[in-house]
Amino acid sequence: MAKLIPTIALVSVLLFIIANASFAYRTTITTIEIDESKGEREGSSSQQCRQEVQRKDLSSCERYLRQSSSRRSPGEEVLRMPGDENQQQESQQLQQCCNQVKQVRDECQCEAIKYIAEDQIQQGQLHGEESERVAQRAGEIVSSCGVRCMRQTRTNPSQQGCRGQIQEQQNLRQCQEYIKQQVSGQGPRRSDNQERSLRGCCDHLKQMQSQCRCEGLRQAIEQQQSQGQLQGQDVFEAFRTAANLPSMCGVSPTECRF
């Protein structure tokens, strides 16, 4: 849990957790590699949002996220007593954060929350559970402030070639099983069932081209999430587990950055 997750991978997980918090709006946000023909236009839009965010005062949101490293642990609820001073302060900061977010253009609000959460993680050099709590608090901002994180429909030609391989490997069913076992917290020592699932997962990956393995794992987790098998912080753990599966199986790439 103390391992520092690569920022690129963490940001991807952060987006999935934020999207889960926005489920009431029936929207999903994903990070997918983009092709060169669309990259310049979409990259320009993202850059414009970043520039706008840098000009805005989002200090209340920053303070609200900063509290995450000391106030609670994953899965631990804060005791909310009537008149509790800490709770009143948190609620006030969250409301102030929402007011600040509303000063940002609608299409840039999700990017704003992502940006300040990224900054907290990078500047604070947060590890494991601390970075996860920042992601959870970012999700609270999204749901409480009514921010709509729209789905990105970017495509990559290479994904078309991978689709057939992923289907041939039954959407990496054994990898899904192994990830589910790991997320459920069956302990550091692998059971016989876990060993079998891992071997089956490695067989799936070895039958695929290198450039398709991480895409296959990403789609496997997305499928589990859409079926309700993974929610909240479980999504975070699933991506963390999947990131290291190629290395565990002795195939390339050594790490998936989702």
UniProtKB/Swiss-Prot annotation:
Task: Report keywords, A-Z.
Answer: Allergen, Cleavage on pair of basic residues, Disulfide bond, Phosphoprotein, Pyrrolidone carboxylic acid, Seed storage protein, Signal, Storage protein
PTM per Swiss-Prot/TrEMBL: The N-terminus of both large chains is blocked. The C-terminus of the allergen Ric c 1 and allergen Ric c 3 small chains are heterogeneous and the length of the chains can vary from 33 to 36 amino acids and from 36 to 40 amino acids respectively.
- Positions of disulphide bridges: 49-108, 61-97, 98-145, 110-149, 162-212, 175-201, 202-249, 214-256
Record-listed Phosphoserine modification sites: 69
**Signal sequence annotation:** 1-24
Gene3D superfamilies, per this entry?
A: Plant lipid-transfer and hydrophobic proteins
Q: Name one Pfam family in it.
A: Tryp_alpha_amyl
Q: Pro-segment residues?
A: 25-35, 77-86, 154-156, 191-193
In this chain, composition skew of type Basic and acidic residues spans: 73-83
Query: What practical use does it have?
Result: Ric C 3 constitutes the peptidic component of the immunomodulator Inmunoferon.
Instruction: Return the annotated region ranges for Disordered.
Output: 64-87
Q: Where in the sequence is Pyrrolidone carboxylic acid found?
A: 87, 194
Q: Which additional comment does the entry carry?
A: The allergen Ric c 1 small chain acts as a calmodulin (CaM) antagonist that inhibits CaM-dependent myosin light chain kinase with IC(50)= 0.25 uM.
User: What is this protein's function per UniProt?
Assistant: 2S seed storage proteins.
Q: How does it assemble?
A: The 2 mature proteins consist of heterodimers of a small and a large chain; disulfide-linked.
Family to which the UniProt record says this protein belongs: Belongs to the 2S seed storage albumins family.
Task: Spell out the protein name for this chain.
Answer: 2S seed storage albumin protein
* Organism for this UniProt entry: Ricinus communis (Castor bean)
